[in-house]
Curated annotation (Swiss-Prot):
It is a multi-pass membrane protein. Signal peptide: none annotated. Keywords: Endoplasmic reticulum, Membrane, Transmembrane, Transmembrane helix. InterPro entries: TLC-dom, TLCD. One of its GO terms (biological process) is plasma membrane organization. It comes from the Eukaryota. The chain crosses the membrane at residues 40-60, 80-100, 110-130, 139-159, 166-188, 200-220, 238-260. It is found in: Endoplasmic reticulum membrane. Its main location: endoplasmic reticulum. This is Uncharacterized TLC domain-containing protein C17A2.02c.
Length: 290
């Protein structure tokens, strides 16, 4: 009997060890995560990849910027997190069209699934596994709120492997379009270029991109997702449906809050004010400006 992989079985990455899938299957089955074992190796490899980037960041950053060595330990930690965030956003931006093409072929918006889309979401899940590790390890610096955020993000992604609501994943991946500009804004702050012409141009692009993908497109998709959930409220477990509704609204409300903070920060930087905002947006929605 042929063991060739059919197109429907072909993922973004080669399939992982069957032994790993069989090892995690009983746990996944307990929560109805029937598609998760197939992608567990991608999650683990992704988390390892981002940890390697985090380890390499101090070495690379010292060569690229003389400012890095002068930063406090807390600020270097945050700098490295922004480096990892930048890499993650570029990866997801590059895969965005592929993911959109995959989900548009789903016959069912609620329970649609493909191996390729599952692998792309697994890359994101791996990032949040890494993020959870970092926020727990440095909870005295990041605060408990970021630990909770990492857990919530992992929960949302993980339970898409029932499968459930994978169709709407590209909306949240598209949010990463604003992340490179946001991280550039952060790096300019930390290299004494606050209020520079470059930062103002970048800030303008950041605001426009953020409003387009996270506010306009984000809220439209939030409405579409909510309608889909409510129209099938008795099909999926009600607790899961309510959680996704709450998470969906919370993330989009946070985006409104963050964009107001960003506009205020850019306005003050345009006037050369040195005082930093209490909160600064990142790809995880808020990193302390330390």
């Amino acid at each position: 009997m042929s063991s060739a992989v059919t197109p429907s079985d072909q993922g973004l990455l080669p399939r992982g060890p069957i032994a790993l899938e069989e090892f995690v299957k009983p746990f996944c089955d307990r929560f109805g995560l029937t598609k998760l074992p197939r992608h567990m190796h991608v999650i683990l490899l992704s988390a390892l990849f981002y940890q390697i980037i985090n380890i390499l960041s101090p070495v690379i950053s010292r060569h690229l910027s003389t400012h890095y060595a002068k930063l406090s330990k807390k600020t270097r930690l945050n700098w490295d997190a922004h480096v990892v965030s930048s890499v993650q956003s570029i990866v997801l931006i590059c895969l965005g069209y592929t993911c959109l093409k995959e989900v548009n072929a789903f016959p069912d918006k609620l329970f649609g699934y493909s191996v390729v889309a599952g692998d792309i979401y697994a890359l994101t899940a791996g990032y949040f596994v890494w993020d959870l590790y970092i926020t727990v390890r440095y909870v005295h610096i990041t605060g408990i709120g970021f630990v909770i955020h990492a857990i919530a993000a992992l929960f949302v992604i993980t339970f898409s492997y029932r499968p459930y609501l994978m169709y709407y994943g590209p909306t949240y991946l598209s949010w990463e379009l604003s992340t490179p500009f946001l991280n550039i804004h952060y790096f300019l702050d930390k290299t004494n270029r606050t209020g520079s012409k470059f930062q103002m141009i970048n800030g303008f692009i950041l605001i426009v991109t953020f409003i387009c993908v996270r506010i306009a497109w984000g809220w439209f998709s939030a409405y579409s997702t909510a309608i889909e959930i409510l129209n099938h409220i008795n099909v999926a477990p009600w607790a899961l449906s309510l959680f996704y509704l709450a998470a969906n609204m919370s993330l989009n409300c946070l985006n409104l809050f963050w964009v107001s903070k960003m506009i205020d920060a850019i306005r003050r930087r345009a006037h050369g004010e040195k005082k930093s905002t209490p909160l600064q947006v990142t790809s995880e929605y808020a990193k302390k400006n330390i």
